[in-house]
């Protein structure tokens, strides 16, 4: 099964995340199939979320399942699943 989930990057206490498409058997920071966006939780007062909507729709159409966190982030940007 393929999921759309967060891959943690950055330094200690200064994380940022890439929104990636991964096989569920891969570890969190393991091999990714595709990168579809970024999320900076502590960048500004308004947390920065950006993603390629066409790529997300494409992967959802192929059967990829977003994690709960990614689903909430997409909903914040008014992306309908």
Curated annotation (Swiss-Prot):
One of its GO terms (molecular function) is structural constituent of ribosome. GO terms for cellular component: cytoplasm; small ribosomal subunit. Transmembrane segments: none annotated. It holds the Pfam family Ribosomal_S16. One of its GO terms (biological process) is translation. The keyword Transcription regulation does not apply. It comes from the Bacteria. InterPro entries: Ribosomal_bS16, Ribosomal_bS16_dom_sf. Keywords: Ribonucleoprotein, Ribosomal protein. Belongs to the bacterial ribosomal protein bS16 family. This is Small ribosomal subunit protein bS16. It comes from Treponema denticola (strain ATCC 35405 / DSM 14222 / CIP 103919 / JCM 8153 / KCTC 15104). The gene is rpsP.
